[in-house]
């Protein structure tokens, strides 16, 4: 009998849906006993992919431990000491809480990366996706509010006194969280476990004719859009880009531009640079999130 052709996409049976496909990472996790009969091409690529997934998981766990510790300490300090409850620190507190939402979801993402599928079900998929999106938008909106607060403190120091108060900062923070949740409603509605149709997985060798068929099901936590999917996906990308990046970026740049215009005639160049030194930092944080 002739050896099986290892060319991807070559049909191994007359049935139209039975196609050969090399999936070494999935075999390594779900069907390790089949690696002995896989092709040389597959066995050579498995250690690399397995090591890559393991390294990514280690990085995720490291970020989880360090981030959880640091953000928890920041939250504790602001809540524990009354003198720390300033307007700026209240916004920083909300940034730390938003980061904790993302950090708590890292073990789930690391597990999906190692196993190459989502094993936690639909509910946790929606929770993790929502927490991740809430982190992004809440952090961005908090940075924007902090820029507005800086603008009020520098340009309108007297008139803004009644607005720059911890009680007002708490109300603004609550509004930021509410707006963020409204913004991420598409994620809450459309995130789910995506299940690809089961199909036979066929493995052969060049030395002998050997075929084993295994039913493969690949689950991933993702956004599942209604038809037409391309239109929904593109609209969501544009929507998040405008609301979560370009809009806040415009407000932040405008605030610091007005600050520069206000103080440039009253301060030296070095002092002006000190006042606006946090603007590039805010923009970098905005682009990172």
Swiss-Prot record:
Matches recorded under InterPro entries: GPCR_Rhodpsn, GPCR_Rhodpsn_7TM
Compartments where located: Cell membrane
Cytoplasmic side: 80-89, 149-170, 262-289
GO biological process per UniProt: cellular response to glucocorticoid stimulus; regulation of insulin secretion
GO MF annotation list: neuropeptide binding; somatostatin receptor activity
Alphabetical UniProt keywords: Cell membrane, Disulfide bond, G-protein coupled receptor, Glycoprotein, Membrane, Receptor, Transducer, Transmembrane, Transmembrane helix
Transmembrane segments: 58-79, 90-110, 127-148, 171-191, 241-261
Gene3D superfamilies: Rhodopsin 7-helix transmembrane proteins (1.20.1070.10)
Extracellular-side positions: 1-57, 111-126, 192-240
GO CC field: neuron projection; plasma membrane
Topology class, membrane: Multi-pass membrane protein
Main location, first listed in the record: membrane
S-S bonds: 125-221
Glycosylation sites: 40
Sequence similarity: Belongs to the G-protein coupled receptor 1 family.
Record's protein name: Somatostatin-like receptor F_48D10.1
């Amino acid at each position: 009998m002739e050896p099986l052709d290892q060319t991807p996409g070559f049909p191994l049976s007359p049935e139209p849906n039975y196609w050969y496909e090399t999936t070494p990472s999935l075999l390594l996790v779900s069907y390790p006993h089949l690696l002995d009969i896989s092709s040389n091409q597959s066995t050579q690529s498995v250690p690399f992919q397995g090591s890559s997934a393991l390294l990514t998981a280690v990085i995720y766990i490291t970020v989880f431990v360090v981030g959880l510790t640091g953000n928890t300490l920041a939250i504790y300090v602001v809540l524990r000491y009354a003198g720390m409850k300033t307007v700026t620190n209240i916004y920083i507190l909300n940034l730390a809480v938003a980061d904790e939402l993302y950090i708590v979801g890292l073990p789930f993402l690391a597990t999906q990366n190692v196993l190459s599928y989502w094993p936690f079900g639909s509910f946790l998929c929606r929770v993790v996706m929502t927490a991740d999106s809430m982190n992004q938008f809440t952090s961005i909106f908090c940075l924007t509010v902090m820029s507005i607060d800086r603008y009020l403190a520098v340009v309108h120091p007297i008139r803004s006194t009644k607005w720059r108060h911890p009680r007002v900062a708490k109300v603004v923070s609550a509004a930021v969280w509410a707006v963020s949740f409204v913004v991420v409603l598409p994620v809450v509605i459309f995130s789910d476990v995506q299940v690809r149709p089961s199909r036979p997985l066929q493995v052969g060798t060049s030395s002998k004719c050997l075929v084993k068929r295994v039913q493969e099901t690949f689950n991933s936590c993702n956004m599942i859009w209604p038809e037409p999917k391309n239109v929904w996906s593109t609209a969501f990308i544009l929507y998040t880009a405008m609301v979560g990046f370009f809009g806040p970026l415009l407000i932040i740049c405008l605030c610091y531009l007005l600050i520069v215009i206000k103080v440039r005639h009253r301060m030296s160049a070095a002092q002006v640079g000190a006042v606006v030194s946090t603007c590039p930092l805010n923009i970098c944080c905005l682009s990172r999130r």
